[in-house]
Amino acid sequence: MTSHDVRDVLNLPSDHAGPRPSKKARTATPRPNLKGLAREVQNLGGDNPIAIVPEVSIFKKRRTVSRKPAAKWELKAFTNSARGDDGALVLRHWKRKPDGTVQDGSAEGQDSAATADNSADKPEDSSFAKFNVRVSVPQYSEDQYNTNLKHPDWTKEETDYLLELAKDFDLRWPIIWDRYEYAPQQPEGETPDGMAVVPASKPRTMEDLKARYYEVAAKMMAVQKPAQYMTRPEFELYEMMLHFDPKQEQNRKRFAENTLKRSSDEAREEEALLLEIKRIMARTERFNEERRELYNRLDYPASESDINSFKTSAGLQSLLQTLLNVDKSKKRKSIMAPENGVPPAAAAAAATAALPPAAAAVAAAPEVPPAASRRESLAASSTAGANDHHEPPVREPPVRHERQESRSHHRNESRSERADRHGAHGHHHRDSVSQTPATPAEAPTPVPAPAPAANKKKGPQQPERRKLSEHEEQVYGVSHHDRLGSGPTFRYEKINKLYSHKSGQQQMRITNLLLELDIPARLIMPTAAVTAQFEVLWGAVTTLVDLRKMSDKVDAEIKLEEAKKAERERAAREAAEARGETVEKKGGEEEGEGGGADDKQKDGGGAGGDDAKDKSGESAQADEQKNDQKAEDAKAQKEQQGEGQDQQKKGEEGLVVPIKEGGGEKGQGDAAAAATAAEKEAESSSNQPKIKEEADENGSSSGAGASSGARQHKRSASVLSNASDKSTKKQKK
């Protein structure tokens, strides 16, 4: 705030008593009065209004006047030489006078004026006379007419008259036909009656006039220049005039006249008919093409060879694969250059010659349409493998679950045989990605692609790609795979994945086996070649470990079956011996009882009827005791069988668990332990009959003791046999 403002607020007088200077007055400019849309547009500008260009009220731009003197025009006479009247008609028109006229009175000026007067007296030719082009009609002599142009319906005079009219009216045929009035000449001499003879003129149509003129022109054109020396336009004109047909021209005009006279309904109907005809023609053409293709496929040379080899399923499958290979090799264009200078056509011929006669005859069938691009065989390797191993080849296309089964079934064999193939031929290059792994052991047999058919279409043919050698593929890093992975991976990670799919015991065995071969488990420099060879070695080692495991499993099963067989034989032998001893004991007891009775009878010598009754009662009681003892033995035997079954269920775990291999991963030690347990059980069961025999020899007469020995023996045999049978069933599952 300044002192002046403070004084003003406090109403104090200023230091300077003089009047305050007045502000500069602003000039009030008239604001444009906008209305309607212009005002709305102006308001959109806000603080920065849009600049509006003022309207200019100028009606017409001022004319630029030249300061040169005005040009002079003069009325001059002219004639038209195209009329052919030698300048009889003289016309006049205004023409601009040329500049540079001399106005002084010198001699040169007088001479130029005199020349101008002379030129003014003689009218000039019209500038449009140069556009008058005369038609050149054929010219001929008397001899040429008599030789080439004679016609029974035309005379030479009438032909000359026609050519004159054509020349005068520039081949405008409607005018020529309208002005054509030929009157034949009267014959010389007088008739016997003294009357004049007036020959009648023949009526001529426009087509007759055209036909005669074109005939004369074509023949004279051929006389002046033979057809073999004519240029292409000249020969086309010659052919057109020579083949002019007056009847066809009349029909064309009549058809055009009728077309112009038809109604709108007839025009629409005719248009619909034309569309239907086009549709029918297109359908007929397509049908003819398909029928021609079918005929070409069915038309094949008859085979004279024996067809017995194709009556079996294997022969038919082999023939199918051969035909597929030949068909694909014909349809697929080769992407590789011919090797050793052998053209693809010669290679295809050699491949067809190598086929069986019947297959070659079928393969020689023509193909429609002719394929410009031929494909290589996609199933050559699978066919070769099927022929080498006498197995039915894989069907094309393979089913998914069949592919998985064949892959799991031939995994071990494919690894070992792939190792041989890699070692002998380096990296295997596959021509097809659809080859199934069911027959990976065989090396692929590439079928050379035949030469592509000559491409008659316009445009240059694409060059074929050159095939790289093995060294070039190694240099450029080119490789071929059965299938591509999900993404980029490191080679050592790829090797680690091989270990991750195995159990700990199998990993330990594989590692020990590799250490025996002086090969580290982790590669130091895993290049592509080293990794491939390591995968081959890994496959061979895995196959060897699996075979060892299967061998141990089979050995354990053999030992178990032998122990079961020995136990069955021992049990049968002991049962037979026990039956023989029982019969002998029963016979001895009966003999002893009979002898005692005789002695008593002898000692009694005359005993009464009471003693006899007592003795008979005692014998009856002895028989009842024997029967009771037999019943008790049978009952005890049934109880032994029931107890044996209970002990068998309880002992299954003890006998079956050592035999199981823990998911297929335990080795020889578990099988040996199972065999040892079986032998111990057999020995313990075999000791039971010995104890029984010792008890019998010591005079043990108690039936319970004898039955207990037999019970223990039968129990051990039944438990071992039943447990072994159930363990065998579980192993089979």
From Swiss-Prot:
Domain of life: Eukaryota
InterPro entries: DAMP1_SANT-like, Swc4/Dmap1
One GO CC term on file: NuA4 histone acetyltransferase complex
Coiled-coil segments on the chain, per record: 247-299
Main location: nucleus
Pfam families attached to this UniProt entry: SANT_DAMP1_like
Record field: compositional bias (Basic and acidic residues): 387-423, 463-484, 564-589, 610-653
Gene3D superfamilies: Homeodomain-like
PANTHER family found in the cross-reference section: DNA METHYLTRANSFERASE 1-ASSOCIATED PROTEIN 1, DNA METHYLTRANSFERASE 1-ASSOCIATED PROTEIN 1 FAMILY MEMBER
Oligomer and partners: Component of the SWR1 chromatin-remodeling complex and of the NuA4 histone acetyltransferase complex.
Listed name of the protein: SWR1-complex protein 4
Designated gene of the protein: crc-1
